[in-house]
Amino acid sequence: MKFRALMQDPLYMKEFQAIVATLTKLAKDCVMILGSRQMHFIVNEDQSSAASPLVWAGITAEEYFPEYRMEAAHPDQEYIVLGVSSANLGRALSVLRGGGVNSCKLKLQRIQFPCISVIASVLTSSSTEAREVVHDVPVTIIPGSDWSAYVVPRVPNSQLALGLPSLRLLKSLIDKLKNISPSLEFQVNVDGELNVIATSEMSTVTSRFQKLLIRTVSGSQQEASCSVDSRKASAFFGALQLPNEELTIGIDREHSIHLQIDVRQDVVLHSILPAVCM
């Protein structure tokens, strides 16, 4: 069983760190699924607090890593699956936020315990030579017999999906609306309109976004709506550490809301907010 990956682009290193930092704010632990061409991070609802949603990130290896090698424990296995403290991994990667980082290696090792070693080559202002900053993050190797509990989630089939250009505005709005109602109703239609509705005993507050980009329409569907837990919605938006402003909101009527942030073409952060009974 072997895994080694190398990052060298400063922007890609910061994006990778921001993805892990987002997961850190949602749960203490996460799962890493290391494939031959793709890496996934998953935060399941049973790993997080009751107020956190299901979140996962898919990263195509060639986007971030000019060097990427994975060898599973057995020839018939396609992955290495690891359990890891998202907080510990986040702290190890925090060095990537600053300047002067030439490269960062990720390496699966067994020292006194299985670990992912984060090895950053950092230039300091007092020296022309780079120094290595090493963090060994303990991991749990999940055996193949348990993999069925750690499958990459399936993106739901949305009847309607809209692109929202201002993530910051929606984030601020949901943070306020969660104090009005325990649930939020999201309504979208083919006119490119999104309504976010919070209802209490005293009032109903409707916030409207218009002229949004229509990304998906299923058949002759004219509109779709779904109500979700306002705490879960707020937890997702509040955890985001990525600089991206664009967000895709897809609604699978009465089942779930799918939130998607395309960090770049083959690096995507997903969340599914399940419907609540009204």
Curated annotation (Swiss-Prot):
Family: Belongs to the HUS1 family.
GO biological process: double-strand break repair via homologous recombination; female pronucleus assembly; meiotic DNA integrity checkpoint signaling; meiotic recombination checkpoint signaling; mitotic DNA damage checkpoint signaling; mitotic DNA replication checkpoint signaling; mitotic intra-S DNA damage checkpoint signaling; nucleotide-excision repair
Phenotypic consequence of gene deletion: Viable but females are sterile. Aberrant formation of the karyosome, the compact spherical cluster of condensed chromosomes that forms in the oocyte nucleus during meiotic prophase. Aberrant synoptenemal complex disassembly in the oocyte; possibly contributing to the karyosome phenotype. The karyosome and synaptonemal complex phenotypes are caused by persistent DNA double stranded breaks that activate a CHK2 meiotic checkpoint pathway. Activation of the meiotic checkpoint leads to defective oocyte localization.
UniProt keywords, alphabetically: Cytoplasm, Nucleus
Tissue specificity remark: Expressed in ovary.
Name recorded for this polypeptide: Checkpoint protein Hus1-like
Functional summary from the UniProt entry: Component of the 9-1-1 checkpoint clamp complex. Involved in both meiotic and somatic DNA damage responses. Essential for activation of the meiotic checkpoint in response to double-strand DNA breaks; required for the S-phase checkpoint but not the G2-M phase checkpoint. Involved in double strand break repair by homologous recombination during meiosis; influences the organization of chromosomal DNA in the meiotic nucleus.
Classification via Pfam families: Hus1
Coiled-coil portions: none
Localization per record: Cytoplasm; Nucleus envelope
Quaternary state and interactors: Component of the 9-1-1 checkpoint clamp complex consisting of Rad9 isoform A, Rad1 and Hus1-like; the interactions with Rad1 and Rad9 are direct. This complex probably also forms with Rad9 isoform B, however 9-1-1 complex containing Rad9 isoform A localizes to the nuclear periphery.
Annotated Gene Ontology cellular component terms: checkpoint clamp complex; cytoplasm; nucleolus; site of double-strand break
Keyword Amino-acid biosynthesis: no
